[in-house]
């Protein structure tokens, strides 16, 4: 039987009251500082490998110097190294990484391995939200097959999936911080596949609704812990572009669902939508089992400690992350952390609220597309599905904006000071106004039935703001709460999913009362009122973070 203290090793460091919310683990900072100094030594070294072996990002002395200066000037890095050395000198029983270049540290993995993991996580993060909207075009067939005329039940088949997105992360994210990312990915992926089969064979409308909720719970795993996985693999100053790729999933997935569903529903029927989802998800799940390995450093170190205890017989050995909490207290602290962060952190609550509003607008717009383009512009069901691509084009433009500027802004501003997560919010400050602009264009061009390309242009503007809002918020949360990244992103996913599930239910009544023009104008005015939120946290976020750091 394992030592109870060793069972509590994976996450005990995350429960210390003295740990600041924006500190990163000492080993990671030591690793970053070491590589930053190497990057600034000679330009010839810049063309070989960065800290992850990615030569494209350090192929100029200017880029390398910025990164090196930023890392050398990090006071957190210096203090963590001193603390690490002090602990090692005092207690020889502490188990740590074998130096800054330890190959078992995910930060030191080969570039191909890191990028493969990020690609697989991003893929499953695309597939899961795809399942949220893929049934939207099949709702009329579902109601007809089950002999129901209740339109609200039809909408519930779609929205209850998002309620599963809200419930799942509250359990999945904390468990990933106890037992690692991989067990949660694998278990949830298998459950998702089984529940997808159930949805494809559902005998009644009520069973379909219940299975869709459970399907959403299982499918929430990549939304809950994907950001944490990227935090495990990529240091802060290089994290932006990878978070941008990851964030495409929650936005492009719901957009491509109706595109695929529009044609497949007419050709094969609504049940084939679930079989298609199963084939896509099952393929990625099989690859995940073969390729992916644990990325969470705390769990890796706990496993190393247990192996050394068994090998040496020295049960006094303990992980550098272990502060001796009992398993019961560890469970209690970890499981309630996402809820506490959502309630007690103004940063997570307000930014998640703003992002949830924009994300809810996405699903609300979905309810208007069949009416606007089917009745106003007389598009067929299949062609109506294609209009969702306007949102996708906006997402791609938003990704380019974020990918080009985010990491460059962080390095440029941090060259003479500390790496501050607030620098991630600057692209969001620039583009937040594209959300109300897009809503105004879409609403009033549809109201007066001008050429069909104009409302689609409006959705492009909205898509830009949606993507930048999502990726900036997620990247900022991961950078600011690195040690609790999974719990922080889970708290964000909960609010985003609740609003995404409930807001569309109010759409038909609102548009019936106000019309498509003034209805979208109301949404635009609300979005306009929220535009200062990113600026507030860009300016005052650091102060707010430090004032609330010990709450959870």
From Swiss-Prot:
It comes from the Eukaryota. Residues 38-47, 71-80 have a biased composition (Polar residues). Keywords: Cell membrane, Glycoprotein, Membrane, Transmembrane, Transmembrane helix, Transport. GO terms for molecular function: transmembrane transporter activity. Glycans are attached at residues 73, 314. It is found in: Cell membrane. The chain crosses the membrane at residues 118-138, 153-173, 182-202, 214-234, 244-264, 272-292, 346-366, 385-405, 425-445, 452-472, 498-518, 521-541. Residues 1-102 are annotated as: Disordered. Residues 16-27 have a biased composition (Low complexity). GO terms for cellular component: plasma membrane. Its main location: membrane. InterPro entries: MFS (IPR011701), MFS_dom (IPR020846), MFS_trans_sf (IPR036259). Pfam families: MFS_1. The keyword rRNA-binding does not apply. It is a multi-pass membrane protein. Belongs to the major facilitator superfamily. MFS-type transporter; part of the gene cluster that mediates the biosynthesis of atranorin, a depside of polyketide origin that accumulates in the cortical or medullary layers of lichen thalli. This is MFS-type transporter atr4.
